[in-house]
């Protein structure tokens, strides 16, 4: 066992001072401070997928730049906090920027609600939290009475929460910037983290509310529309010029999507956007872990022998010239496994799915019921390891998702990390087009983790759709009386409507997907069946599925086969029935006097078709 002392892992830590003061492992992104803050753009927007470290980046910028109100322009705190980082090697830059700038930092990642009033109150709370950091200015002799009254309003939460005072919230950034300029004689730097979360949440709430209140003719789902209007006012500060009162010197913003410039960012000048398609090599590695950073991280925790396993499951993202890993995945993998390795328990090391179940899955799940035949083909190509082409919308709005436009859907998946650009197939001329122009691009699923997310969401959609169409009664009845045609009709319809996820990348048996497909469907039938078992010992083996129905008077045994060759279907179905009898899967049911009928089924799947053979055993 190694005697090496390992640094604490930065698990769930997106606060830079806490990470550094806690002596946590740190991937040094400090050289990007100079790249960003010597860039001539007035406003820089970085869009990257979730879990890629955007919040930590903003926190690092804030920690490096901000003035210490107790000792203005003294950078001793920063010298300690950034000790050992690469940026301290650039003395000229540090002298000019480190601890020398008034900074306003706000995160919008927790703004949520079920109606506009709740969204507003959540947003106002975030603004109050920021404004409270500047309460010390109330004692400043450089601010006049009206300045201090404005600050008092911003630091009084009960005042801000009243929706009739929303203009004060809209003007908050401009107000704070103006006050800081009076105090320090320098224009503030504005840092906004996850700017588009309120818009994404409002759009999703509109879609939910349309369903909840579909019978109310007076109801209008307008959360997103109102949030856009409100936030346009909040972002007005970005349109100021250096000579304007309350102007800022620079703004850095992060998010997942670039909302249409003709709405939220209308009138913003000298505006640079750095998306997952950006070709500016100076900034491609700023968010996320590069391949070299990831491999060093693994080596530092003595997991370098598992680099290829980590690459297979979590790599695959390509931002211009760099292979990128999601930091959330890398940190979780190391956190869960490095002690196993130290203890020699290498068989226990697992590559789990750390992406599944987070809120962004909603967009994929919501759209699945609207897949066209063309979309189905593209989805199938994706899960089979191929690239798909579509017109990328780089300036989309969250509310357009309700229109279920295919190109917007694929664009959303690319921006949120479900897909990554296929740079080899995408044309350089297309990529160089202006952000306002839709581009013809190629994209693919980046890795096995995301492939599993596609599979899981689509299987869940099968089950949900099954419930909505009340097919569970028909299916259980059909299985309970040997109605092969009804079973075939139900399955055929489902297979035609949805893409079949085949886990080819993991080289799993073809039956695995269809087995999961049936398990998902029967989950929605839980009130109609009892003693449902999957791969449960019965007779001399393990039938794929068994259950009882009709008050435990009927028993059903299912054996599943799959093939890519239609000509083999009849033979496989016959073999499936033979397997049930040869291995005596029915024996436990034969012994139960209450069971009056036993049905054996050989189900064979071939792509989007199936075959049902049935034999009554009792």
Language-model features: where?
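Walker A/P-loop-proximal flanking segment of P-loop NTPase domains
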Residues: 2-88
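Conserved P-loop NTPase mechanochemical-coupling segment
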Residues: 11-15, 105, 109-118, 122-170, ...
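P-loop NTPase motor core
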Residues: 28, 34, 69-136
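Flexible phosphate/Mg2+-sensing switch loops adjacent to catalytic phosphate-binding sites
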Residues: 64-99, 213-216, 220, 224-230, ...
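Substrate-engagement module of ASCE P-loop NTPases
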Residues: 131, 172-184, 212-249, 585-588
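Structural recognition of the conserved hydrophobic beta-strand(s) that form the central parallel beta-sheet
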Residues: 189-193, 232-233, 249-256
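Amphipathic alpha-helical segments of the small helical/lid subdomains adjacent to P-loop NTPase cores
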Residues: 260-269, 274-335, 341
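Extended alpha-helical interface modules used as scaffolds for assembling large macromolecular complexes
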Residues: 271-272, 276, 325-584, 595, ...
């Amino acid at each position: 066992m190694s005697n090496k002392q390992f640094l604490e892992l930065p698990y769930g830590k997106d606060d830079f001072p806490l990470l550094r003061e806690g002596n946590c492992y740190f991937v040094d992104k400090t050289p990007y401070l100079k790249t960003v803050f010597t860039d001539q753009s007035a406003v820089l927007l970085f869009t990257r997928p979730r879990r890629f470290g955007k919040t930590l980046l903003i926190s690092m910028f804030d920690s490096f730049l901000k003035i210490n109100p107790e000792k203005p322009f003294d950078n001793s705190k920063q010298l300690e906090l950034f000790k050992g980082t690469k940026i301290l090697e650039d003395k000229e830059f540090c002298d000019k920027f480190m601890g020398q700038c008034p900074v306003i930092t706000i995160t919008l990642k927790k703004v949520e609600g079920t109606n506009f009033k709740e969204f507003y109150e959540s947003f106002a709370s975030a603004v109050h939290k920021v404004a409270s950091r500047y309460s010390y200015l109330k004692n400043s002799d450089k601010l006049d009475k009206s300045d201090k009254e404005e600050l008092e309003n911003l630091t009084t939460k009960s005042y801000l929460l009243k929706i009739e005072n929303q203009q004060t919230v809209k003007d908050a950034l401009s107000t704070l910037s103006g006050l800081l300029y009076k105090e320090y004689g320098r224009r503030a730097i504005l840092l906004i983290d996850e700017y588009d979360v309120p818009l994404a949440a409002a759009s999703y709430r509109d879609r939910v509310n349309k369903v909840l209140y579909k019978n109310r003719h007076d109801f209008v789902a307008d959360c997103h529309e109102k949030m856009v209007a409100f936030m346009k006012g909040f972002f007005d500060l970005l349109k100021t010029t250096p000579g304007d009162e309350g102007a800022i010197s620079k703004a850095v913003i992060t998010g997942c999507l670039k909302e249409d410039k003709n709405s939220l960012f209308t009138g913003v000048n000298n505006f640079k956007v750095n998306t997952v398609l950006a070709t500016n090599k100076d900034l491609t590695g700023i968010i996320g872990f590069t391949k070299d950073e990831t491999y060093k991280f693994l080596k530092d925790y003595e997991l370098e022998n598992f680099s290829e396993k980590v690459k297979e499951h979590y790599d695959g993202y390509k931002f211009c010239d760099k292979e990128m890993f999601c930091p959330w995945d890398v940190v979780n993998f190391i956190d869960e496994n490095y002690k196993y390795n130290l203890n020699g328990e290498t068989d226990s090391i697992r590559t789990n799915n750390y992406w599944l179940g987070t809120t962004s899955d909603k967009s994929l799940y919501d759209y699945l019921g609207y897949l066209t035949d063309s979309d189905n083909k593209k989805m199938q190509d994706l899960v089979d390891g191929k690239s798909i082409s579509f017109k990328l919308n780089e300036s989309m709005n969250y509310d357009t998702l309700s229109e279920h436009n295919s190109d917007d859907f694929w664009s959303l998946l690319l921006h949120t990390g479900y897909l990554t650009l296929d740079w080899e197939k995408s044309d350089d001329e297309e990529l160089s087009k202006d952000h306002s122009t839709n581009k013809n691009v190629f994209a693919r699923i980046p890795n096995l983790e995301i492939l599993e997310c596609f599979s899981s969401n689509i299987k869940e959609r099968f089950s949900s759709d099954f419930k909505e169409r009340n097919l569970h009664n028909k299916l259980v009845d059909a299985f309970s009386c040997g109605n092969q045609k009804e079973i075939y009709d139900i399955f055929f319809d489902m297979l035609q409507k949805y893409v079949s996820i085949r886990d080819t990348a993991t080289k799993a048996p073809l039956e695995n997907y269809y087995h999961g497909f049936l398990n998902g469907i029967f989950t929605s039938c839980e009130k109609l069946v009892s003693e449902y078992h999957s791969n449960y010992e019965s007779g001399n083996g393990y039938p794929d599925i068994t259950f009882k129905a009709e008050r435990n008077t009927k028993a059903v045994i299912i054996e599943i086969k799959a093939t890519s060759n239609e000509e083999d279907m009849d033979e496989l179905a016959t073999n499936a029935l033979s397997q049930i009898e040869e291995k005596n899967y029915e024996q436990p049911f034969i012994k139960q006097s209450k069971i009056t009928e036993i049905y054996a089924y050989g189900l064979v799947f071939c792509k989007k078709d199936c075959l049902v053979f049935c034999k009554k055993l009792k």
